[in-house]
Design a protein with these regions (language model features):
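Acidic, polar ligand-binding/catalytic clefts
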Residues: 1-39, 95-121
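Bilobed "Venus flytrap"/periplasmic-binding protein-like clamshell domains
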Residues: 20-78, 96
Length: 200
């Protein structure tokens, strides 16, 4: 997640956002809880130790005046196992993470991700500060995938786009221009990205 402290304090540069996520909560269906507005004092919540997720959880419960017990672990698999074993009433992390971790539960269909989102989590590629060439390459790799989607270029049709009538598409797939030269790359670097990972 792109945060001010991570951007300013730990020597990293965030080059863009490729996914906006947000923190949510998962509960057991048989709890009858369908909204965070139903959370009561004494609730226990599993999450990862020392993360923005833990801080967001604290802020959420404090802002609602709900007393809670944090149940924290360093590793995501430990959090999932604890929640699955019933050591906490709810599990909180980014909603994409909840969806992915839910399938690891012993009975995935017995759990539901609640509709509320309590934070904005801009996710994207990160590089170390001080390497401006690598930063540019990573940024323009992200831009390549976004532009490929705008033009309808996929991993399946990327090669055929070399003969497009659109000059911008031809430049993007390396059939015209010298887009890679500024970074010391060959002209098909964008094409290889699209062929390997597709578009945005």
């Amino acid at each position: 997640t792109w945060t001010l402290s991570r951007d300013a304090d730990i020597g990293l540069t965030f080059v863009g956002v490729n996914f906006y996520d947000g923190q949510g909560f998962m509960v057991r269906k048989n709890s009858g809880v369908t909204s965070t507005s139903q959370f009561k004092d004494g609730i226990s919540a599993c999450t990862n130790l020392g993360t923005t997720t833990e801080l967001n959880m604290r802020d959420f419960f404090n802002s609602k005046g709900i007393s809670y017990t944090p149940v924290t672990f360093e590793k995501a698999d430990e959090v999932v196992a604890a929640y699955d074993a019933g050591r906490c009433d709810t599990y909180t992390t980014d909603k994409s993470g909840l969806a992915a971790q839910r399938i690891k539960l012993s009975s995935p269909d017995d759990h539901v991700v609640l509709p509320e989102t309590i934070s904005k989590e801009p996710l994207g590629p990160v590089v170390r500060q001080g390497d401006s060439v690598w930063e540019d390459i990573v940024r323009w790799s992200l831009n390549t995938m976004i532009e490929a989607e705008e033009y309808g270029i996929t991993s399946a049709n990327a090669d055929s786009m070399k003969t497009s009538e659109n000059p911008a598409i031809k430049r993007l797939v390396g059939a015209e221009g010298e887009m890679g030269a500024a970074f010391g790359l060959d002209n098909e670097w964008n094409l290889r990205i699209i062929k390997q990972v597709g578009n945005y």
